[in-house]
Regions:
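Short acidic alpha-helix initiation/capping motifs at coil-to-helix transition points
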Residues: 176-177, 362
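Short, flexible active-site loop motifs that bind/organize anionic cofactors or intermediates
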Residues: 18, 119, 145, 249, ...
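Bacterial N-terminal signal peptides that target proteins for export
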Residues: 1-6
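Catalytic loop of the DD-peptidase/beta-lactamase superfamily, centered on the K-T-G motif
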Residues: 21-57, 157, 187-200, 204, ...
């Protein structure tokens, strides 16, 4: 396995090894190898920076299951929601230049933008776009971008039809679509696309020459990881998420060598090249790492009890919490078959980035192992690989119990209220758009018009509820429940994820499809 040392970075010359009494590379390498196996992950790439230098960068495992091509420190991964911090950094640059303020109304730059309420539309600020307290629900609108043909402008337009889940600024609910809206501000303010601003104002100054913002950039690389997921109980390659329509929220592809430069810059309040340059002011560095939204602190499962923080907040593109008595600034990212975690401990000038080509919690397990080693956690220390594996088993057991209870309560002898042909026809949801239900070979088939992957055979469950078994196996199956008018016609259908473990981006619950009347 190849290690890329600090000579790869312009920010430092050859870096010394981590102190032997704190960190043993061979022990950590063995731990990673075990983690790959236990948490069912083909490959990972890891870098650690401290005091302005990259201490090590290294790849582990393979880029694609069943292949021999190894992951190294230059292997590209989709970093998903770790993109959000790049978007807020680019906004901070414009704030420093006086081109916008965090508390400017969004409609100052996007006059046609609307949300669910005129008051919220008028009051919503740039800060609100990136702090997850707009009143929209968790993952609201994610089905607009996921495997869809909608572009960013269309998504920003359609989010006006999303119904609120709470009052404005009253509760935290993570979202992606408003980061897309934030990306739409850049052409109005900077005269450049979000992509161009990130490339010219962030990547180029930091020397991040191996990073990009498009799916084409990622797929054109000869050293890119392949996404993997668990299907039918087996680790398998899954389709790559095309992220061009969500790039400001999750579209960057990078590697740990480039991201180490990013970490060093963030740990030095926006300075780079040994302090000779600046991305953004120290004031903006503080603002981005200041709490903006209070996060709930649920009790973790017993194996992870030690990870319960004393405080948790969301800043501007970053999560803030404590660990081992230090403030920790971090974020995670996840797309189909790809996961990432960036963790910074500002008081220690310490940063860790871990990229993996699976949807497991390996990134978290290895992050906490490194933090324990480098921050001197008291002994005996947790075995985080085992702890996260146990937590996963607990979650899956609970989900299985819920599904079994649902099966036990099902009225399997019930029949649909109508002949199947009466459910067929065109439907429309204000938020998503058009869908269709067709009778094909004696069964109903559901299709989402703007999402070609969403083609599902409707398997009767009970009464007027069916289950959409998507032909693309990596998609989460959904209950589809039809409601009838008093005269026996279909009035609407609504959806809900079948699995309790379904990712929140499968926000079926936000959809309400009604029949489209035939033109007269």
């Amino acid at each position: 396995m190849r290690i890329t040392v600090a000579a790869a970075l312009a920010l430092a010359t050859a870096a010394p090894a981590l102190p032997a009494q704190v960190f043993r590379q061979k022990d950590f390498d063995a731990y990673v190898a075990r983690g790959l196996q236990v948490l069912r992950t083909p490959g990972a790439s890891i870098a650690v920076v401290r005091n302005g230098r990259m201490l090590f960068a290294k790849g582990y495992g393979v880029r694609t299951i069943g292949d021999t091509a190894r992951v190294d420190a230059h292997t590209l991964f989709q970093i998903a929601s770790n993109t959000k911090a790049f978007t807020t950094a680019a906004l901070a640059i414009l704030v420093d230049e006086g081109k916008l303020a965090w508390d400017d109304p969004v409609t100052k730059f996007l006059p046609g933008f609307q949300l669910y309420d005129p008051y919220v539309t008028r009051e919503l600020t740039v800060r609100d776009l990136v702090t997850h307290k707009s009143g929209l629900g968790l993952g609201a609108g994610d089905l607009l971008w996921f495997h869809s043909s909608y572009n960013r402008a269309e998504i920003a337009h359609r989010i006006r039809f999303a119904r609120p889940a709470s009052s404005f600024r009253s509760a935290y609910a993570y979202d992606n679509v408003l980061y897309i809206v934030a990306g739409e501000i850049f052409p109005a303010v900077a005269g450049q696309s979000w992509d161009d601003v990130v490339k010219t104002r962030v990547f180029t100054p930091l020397g991040m020459s191996e990073s990009g913002t498009t799916t084409a950039f990622f797929t054109s690389s000869r050293n890119a990881a392949t996404p993997h997921g668990i299907e039918d109980g087996k680790l398998q390659v899954v389709p790559l998420d095309s992220v061009d329509n969500i790039s400001p929220a999750g579209g960057i592809a990078s590697n740990v060598t480039d991201l180490a430069r990013w970490l060093v810059c963030r740990l030095d309040s926006g300075r780079y090249s040994g302090g000779g340059g600046r991305l953004f002011s120290e004031a903006q560095a503080r603002e981005m790492w200041s709490g903006q939204t209070i996060l709930p602190i649920p009790d973790p499962p017993p194996p992870l009890a030690a990870l319960r923080p004393n405080f948790a907040e969301y800043g501007l593109g970053w999560r803030l919490r404590d660990y081992l008595g230090r403030k920790v600034v971090s974020h995670t990212g996840g797309l189909a078959g790809m996961s990432s975690q960036i963790t910074l401990v500002p008081a220690e000038k310490l940063g860790v980035v871990i990229l993996t080509n699976s949807e497991s919690d390996l990134m978290a397990a290895l992050t906490y192992r490194l933090l324990d080693d480098l921050l001197g956690a008291p002994r005996p220390r947790a075995d985080w690989v085992a702890a996260f594996a146990q937590a996963d088993q607990i979650a899956r057991a609970r989900a299985d119990s819920t599904l079994q209870a649902g099966r036990a309560g099902r009225d399997s002898m019930s029949q649909p209220s109508l002949p199947l042909a009466r459910y067929a026809g065109p439907y429309r949801d204000d938020l998503y758009g058009d869908a269709s239900v067709a009778l094909e070979d004696g069964r109903l088939v559901l299709r989402f018009s703007r999402s070609p992957a969403f083609v599902g055979d409707l398997e009767h469950w009970q009464y007027d509820t069916f289950i959409a078994r998507w032909r693309a196996k990596h998609l989460e199956d959904a209950y589809v429940t039809f409601a009838l008018t008093p005269d026996g016609a279909v009035d609407r259908f609504q959806m809900a994820a079948v699995s309790p473990l379904a990712d929140f981006s499968f926000d079926y619950q936000d959809l309400l499809f009604r029949p489209v009347a035939a033109p007269r």
